[in-house]
Amino acid sequence: MSGIFIAIILLTILALLFGILLGFAAEKFKVEGDPLVDQLEALLPQTQCGQCGYPGCRPYAEAIANGEKINLCPPGGSATMEKLAEMAGVEPEPLSATEEVQVKKVAYIREEECIGCTKCIQACPVDAILGSGKLMHTVITDYCTGCDLCVAPCPVDCIDMLPVEQTVKNWDWKLNAIPVKTLDEDCQC
């Protein structure tokens, strides 16, 4: 019985020593990231669609910090591009020519043709497609960014990209362009 307690105590001491060693190494060899890259990445839509020519939003944020164009993110639209311009300290540019003419589109699945293969669900970077294996799928249009990544994997071509009508609910009001003054808590107004 005492052999088990000795083994437990030795393993506990060994675990504590390794924990201290790993904690020290983590602090000693810590790699600081660029705070500008973190801020730029937070502004991007995080769809990881690759339409900008980079494999994800983080590499595109790093490229912007190194001087790349800020108008390459179609899912983000002009609002994201304007915020990126402000953060990067450059002039806003119009979005790429193809995006400037296009209207916002969302995916639409013709459910009567859907075979339930789940390939579109796996391709969607924002989980905007609802469904399960061998059952029809549908798109949650409020979540769809229009990145078009779900269309190509569909084996029966039952996914279309349809333009979104401008309504009061989805109109771009640009409310964050209105300056707002915040009051301090100790202000007696």
UniProtKB/Swiss-Prot annotation:
4Fe-4S domain residues are 32-90
Q: Which SUPFAM superfamilies match?
A: 4Fe-4S ferredoxins
Cofactors, names only: [4Fe-4S] cluster
Q: Which GO terms describe its biological process?
A: electron transport chain
- What PROSITE patterns does the annotation carry? 4FE4S, 4FE4S_FER_1, 4FE4S_FER_2
Q: Where in the cell is it found?
A: Cell inner membrane
Q: Does the keyword Transport apply?
A: yes
Give residues annotated as binding [4Fe-4S] cluster 1: 49, 52, 57, 73
GO MF terms on file? 4 iron, 4 sulfur cluster binding; electron transfer activity; metal ion binding
Identify the EC number(s).
7.-.-.-
Q: What binding partners and quaternary form does the record give?
A: The complex is composed of six subunits: RnfA, RnfB, RnfC, RnfD, RnfE and RnfG.
Q: Please identify the protein, giving its name as recorded.
A: Ion-translocating oxidoreductase complex subunit B
Gene behind this chain? rnfB
